[in-house]
């Protein structure tokens, strides 16, 4: 396959294109997708959710979805976050998106002004660096350690630059798989308050954690933390459902930008995701298997 052949230069564009190609002769998928093998996911539960929604199709499915997102799903997300991360957020503070990719894009375009210094994990997803640069931001790497961002290095950077935001993973950092300790989470949030920058917490792999997980947003400061989650990794990439939990100061700007760029998340996939969530997150049943194989 030409798209998988090694190019003269391996860059973000090549990596993105390779995500949609099968691995020749192996029947698998490239590692760049960040997805689990289909057999690790709950295909039958997804099928059941699709059938359930199909039996109760309503006229509302023939129109645009709600700009902020399907309310029953946002209520479920509020409960899910409280149970799995200790994040206290109301459904009114949640915006659904077309996957975590759109969530990152909306936040970046809302908060970054050309010339802003924007921190990222080092290493991090190359797509994120390109997105920040598209918004005119100047990305600066913060070394990632086994228990989270290097707090000492972060403090040094903050002493040299006025920082607008820090985009980082919490659970299962991409690409190292590192976690986040309570001590480091508290230290990073404390620096965010002292230096007045926004932590953009990308927790798309959080559903793979078997218990209550440590997050930045779980420390109770949605004024300085924006939380991103997604069902694309743990449920189905084709459903493209992500979400943002944030403080009220960012809520309306994000909804307005979402309206301008995509109008709404389709009502059908929102209802399918809601029906699936009502029966529990399928990946939770697969966590012991995932850990055993890894």
Regions found by a protein language model. Give the residues of each.
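N-terminal basic, amphipathic alpha-helical segments
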Residues: 1-51, 255, 259-265, 274-280, ...
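Acidic catalytic patch
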Residues: 202, 269-273
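Short glycine-rich anion-binding loops that position phosphate/pyrophosphate groups of nucleotides
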Residues: 36, 170-173, 233
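Conserved core of the PLP fold type I
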Residues: 50-196, 200, 206-220, 226
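Active-site donor-binding loop signature of nucleotide-sugar glycosyltransferases
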Residues: 2, 33, 144, 210, ...
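Short, well-ordered alpha-helical scaffold segment located
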Residues: 172, 249-250, 281
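Active-site PLP attachment segment
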Residues: 212, 220-253, 265-268
């Amino acid at each position: 396959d030409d798209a998988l052949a090694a190019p003269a230069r391996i860059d973000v564009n090549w990596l993105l294109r390779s995500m949609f190609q099968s691995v020749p002769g192996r029947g698998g998928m490239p590692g760049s997708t960040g997805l689990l093998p289909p057999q690790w996911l709950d295909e039958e539960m997804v099928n059941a959710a699709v059938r359930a929604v199909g039996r109760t199709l309503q006229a509302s499915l023939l129109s645009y979805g709600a700009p902020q997102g399907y309310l029953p799903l946002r209520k479920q997300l509020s409960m899910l976050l409280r149970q799995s991360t200790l994040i206290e957020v109301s459904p009114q503070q949640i915006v659904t998106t077309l996957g975590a990719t759109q969530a990152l894009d909306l936040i970046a375009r809302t908060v970054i002004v050309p010339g802003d210094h924007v921190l990222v994990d080092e290493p991090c997803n190359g797509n994120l660096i390109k997105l920040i640069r598209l918004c005119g931001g100047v990305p600066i790497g913060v070394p990632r350690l086994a228990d989270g961002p290097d707090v000492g290095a972060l403090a040094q950077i903050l002493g040299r630059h006025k920082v607008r935001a820090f985009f980082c993973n919490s659970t299962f950092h991409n690409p190292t798989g590192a976690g986040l300790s309570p001590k480091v989470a508290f230290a990073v949030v404390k620096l965010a308050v002292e230096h007045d920058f926004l932590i953009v917490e990308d927790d798309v792999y959080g559903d793979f954690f078997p218990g209550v997980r440590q997050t930045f947003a779980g420390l109770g400061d949605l004024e300085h933390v924006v939380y991103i989650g997604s069902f694309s990794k743990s449920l189905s990439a084709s459903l493209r459902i992500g979400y943002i939990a944030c403080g009220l100061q960012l809520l309306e700007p994000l909804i307005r930008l979402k309206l301008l760029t995509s109008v709404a998340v389709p009502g059908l996939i929102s209802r399918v995701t809601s029906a699936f969530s009502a029966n529990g997150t399928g990946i939770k049943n697969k966590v012991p298997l995932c850990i055993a194989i890894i």
